[in-house]
Amino acid sequence: MKSLFTALVPLLPLATALPLVSSESPNAQPKSLYPFSSSGSNAKVAGRLFNIDGKVEYFAGTNAWWLAHLSSNSDVDLSFSQMAATGYKIVRVWGFGDANTPPPSTNTDPNLVYFQILNSTGSYINYGADGLQRLDYVVHAASKYGLKLVLNFVNNWGDYGGIAAYTNAFNCSSTSFYTDATCQKVYKNYVKTIVTRYRSSTAIFAWELGNEPRCNGCETSVLTNWASDISSYIKSLDSNHMVTLGDEGWFAPADGIGDGSYAYGGAEGIDWVANLKIKTLDYGVFHLYPNSWGYNYTWGNEWIEQHDKAGKAVGKPVILEEYGTPFPYNHIETEGPWQATVLKSGIAADQIWQFGPNGTSVSAEVFGDVNTIYFKTPEYATLGTGHAKAMSKKKV
């Protein structure tokens, strides 16, 4: 979703003492301090479902964008242990942390860690203790708790850099980013850095091109062509893991779905059906925030059913990857019906936005938002643990 957090604020000049390596040289990466597990098996498509470690089933997952932006290993472990106890199978984590200059050293979690510096001279990867060592630990630890990760490479929104960091450095725009030669070269270098670093790990569920990519006012072919190009590139680097787009699921008029209003009009440059047909995208995702899009909450059930039907027509799995409502500690009335609709549908999985741990050294409310469901709260027993159990028990 469009995060409520402030992006990393560039205030300091680039420090040459920092452990930065040009993204032009991904083969020169320093080795991780933490081993990546190759035990078990890589997740893969099984019809309209997924095979995870030899088991084909429906399941629930969650989002924890902040996980690799925590400085404490114990906080990561605690969060993973609570997700595993819930019955979640996958967790979506930001695989990006972009800035134009390093954040102030006085920053605290989750605004201290950054993975990439972008400026007019190029892109530089931070392999230090406040950089990819944090993502290294997340990938390492996920295996210990039997969880698999969805890692994305860039944010449509300005939080934690995103496309705005590329536009600031290389003078592309939020729409030309997808076709600009320089921006795409740097983006692909970052993709290569992350994919080649973690491709041996069975903890990776899927690579994701971006968080909620949009190209407002563009022909939908712009993003479809970009998604085809980047997913093919990822497959050339790693043919063993799945790839997905990370979009909100907008339909276009050509799809013949819906009433032609905002979610169906293609104004954000997305044609969900056309993108789902891309051979190098293994499954489709969609998000659900009616309050942000001008729809009522009951419409969410229709949105779920429409994506299920379209996914069935194409023959690929579909995940409701994000959903939330702005009612802190009071989400059951609005989100419970959506979960019931998912249970009745052929949707393979859903991932609520978002998970809030209990007991971390940094208060979970620091990186939580109005949509967060917090572990051990009354609503969590229903929307978290209860729903995960119901999904896993659903007959295949």
Regions from the PLM with identified roles:
Residues M1-E24:
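Fungal secretory targeting signals
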Residues H387-V396:
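C-terminal helix/juxtamembrane-tail motif
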Residues F36-P317, Y323-L383:
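Active-site mouth of glycoside hydrolases
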Residues L4, W94, K395-V396:
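Residue-level detector of intrinsically disordered/flexible regions characterized by low predicted structural confidence
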Residues A17-G40:
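Short, basic/low-complexity N-terminal boundary segments at the transition from targeting/disordered tails
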